[in-house]
Design a protein with these regions (language model features):
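Short, ordered beta-strand-loop transition motifs
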Residues: 10, 170-173
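Active-site-proximal cofactor/substrate-binding loop regions of enzyme domains
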Residues: 180
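Bacterial Sec-dependent N-terminal signal peptides
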Residues: 13, 17-32
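Structured domain cores in non-transmembrane regions
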Residues: 29-105, 173-175, 184-347
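Sec-dependent N-terminal signal peptides
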Residues: 5-15
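N-terminal secretory signal peptides that target proteins for export/translocation
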Residues: 1-2
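Mature, soluble, non-transmembrane domains
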Residues: 58-60, 68-171, 301-425
């Protein structure tokens, strides 16, 4: 009997010990991560650019472009029966909107001038042996070694109004069309206008600068009517780029969609303010009280800066998180030169552990450019209701759903815009 009791006690003790072990919480792997968001856009001096063909007397050429408030257009076309003269607006270009924000339209020839590139000694208009229609080849005249200036060489030139007419049409939205007419078939000196270039830019950028030496591209355009080098320069320095706005992050359970749900309407948690105006505050506040979120916060101060601000090209935001196996991370940051677009992972975020191992490396391929569906999209970088020009809550409501952007406009590849790296600490 005593032996049976001893055996019973030993078995009971073993069962209790086993039971206690089964009730212990399993310790999941955890890790600390540094998340870095980098703006990898290449800054561009010009918003857009293009070329137009030669314009014989009695004919015309047109080109169109999108431009928002604060934009200017510049152009240059050679006065062919000269050594190095070209027509263009002032070096600051032509403002496309007036001080009231209304589009400028109509005949803008009054803003056109005949410029001397200062690169070749002038000869009498139409008769000079070193002018394109008379010379044996390009670049044959005597170097002037001067600077760009309004023509003032004591030769007689036909009035600009008898040679060229430039008209500006506003086609709705932010679309404009420029038409250049060659009227010189009835002038005292009929002349072709050579193939030219145009560019859209802000008030800090110039196609050329009065009083300075002409670029090699401007020299070829003004002396030989060859726009290829100037066009190459403009193509390399034109295009879309954008800051990113302060954003939010959340570490959460796999079943949680903390920021948005694909193909569903915005739930009013603050995504609209983030995606339209770059304001993460409402969304950050909402995340703090959302079930299934381990931790959340705002990234808003570029690394090396002392104050919050937008993320400009070559700069980074960074923040540190601690998570355990099973946790996911979501982020969102506005593409500022848009109406309501933002970069984020899928609506469920991405896992911070794979097979029990913490991830580390470039996760940019998991990012997508999303449309919040809250404001009607305008031409990227030119919309007058985008934050740079319109201010908060200025666009037309879309009343749509959150979806991968698909609006017919062209956007850069994700890897050309943003880079997100998660580094194990």
């Amino acid at each position: 009997m005593m032996k049976k009791r001893i055996v019973f006690v030993l078995l009971s003790t073993l069962l209790i010990a086993t039971s206690c072990n089964n009730n212990d919480d399993t310790v999941l792997p955890s890790a600390t991560f540094k998340v870095t968001v980098e703006n990898v856009f290449m800054p561009k001096a010009f918003q857009s650019n293009g070329v137009f063909d030669a314009i014989p007397p009695g004919s015309s050429q047109s080109f169109s472009f999108n431009a928002g408030k604060g934009s200017y257009v510049s152009l240059a076309t050679m006065f062919v029966k000269s050594n190095d003269l070209f027509y263009g607006f002032s070096d600051t270009g032509l403002a496309l909107y007036d001080t009231n924000g209304d589009a400028i339209t109509g005949d803008v020839t009054m803003h056109i001038s005949l410029w001397d590139a200062g690169t070749e000694v002038n000869q009498e208009p139409g008769t000079g042996s070193n002018q394109p229609m008379n010379q044996s080849g390009p670049n044959t005249g005597d170097d002037e070694n001067g600077t760009i200036h309004l023509v003032n060489d004591n030769f007689m030139y036909p009035s600009k109004e008898s040679v060229i007419k430039v008209s500006l049409t506003h086609d709705g939205g932010t679309l404009f069309t420029v038409t250049i007419e060659n009227l010189s078939n009835t002038a005292t000196l009929a002349t072709p206008l050579a193939p030219g270039v145009w560019a859209v830019h802000n008030d800090q950028t110039k196609l050329f600068t009065d009083g300075t030496t002409a670029s090699a591209g401007m020299e070829k355009l003004a002396e030989d009517g060859d726009n290829s080098m100037m066009n190459g320069f403009l193509m390399n320095n034109s295009g879309y780029f954008s800051p990113f706005a302060p954003g939010v992050y959340a570490v959460h359970a796999a079943t949680v969609k903390p920021i948005f749900t694909n193909n569903s309407s915005d739930i009013g948690n603050g995504l609209e303010a983030l995606a339209e105006d770059g304001d993460p505050s409402a969304l950050a506040s909402s995340l703090m009280s959302t079930n299934g979120i381990v931790t959340s916060g705002v990234f808003n101060t570029p690394d090396g800066a002392s104050n919050p601000g937008p993320l400009l090209p070559t700069n980074t935001y960074s923040f540190t998180i601690t998570a355990q196996e099973g946790d996911y991370i979501s982020i969102a940051t506005m593409l500022v030169q848009s109406n309501d677009l933002f970069y984020a992972f899928d609506d469920s975020g991405i896992a911070l552990f794979t097979n029990g191992n913490p991830i580390s490396g470039d996760v940019t391929s998991s990012l997508t450019l999303w449309d919040a569906g809250t404001e009607i999209n305008e031409y990227p970088g030119a919309g007058n209701n985008q934050p740079v020009r319109g201010g908060a809550m200025s666009g037309m409501d879309e009343n749509g759903i959150v979806h991968v952007v698909n609006d017919g406009f062209m956007y850069p590849a994700t890897a050309e815009a943003i880079k997100v790296t998660i580094t194990l600490q």
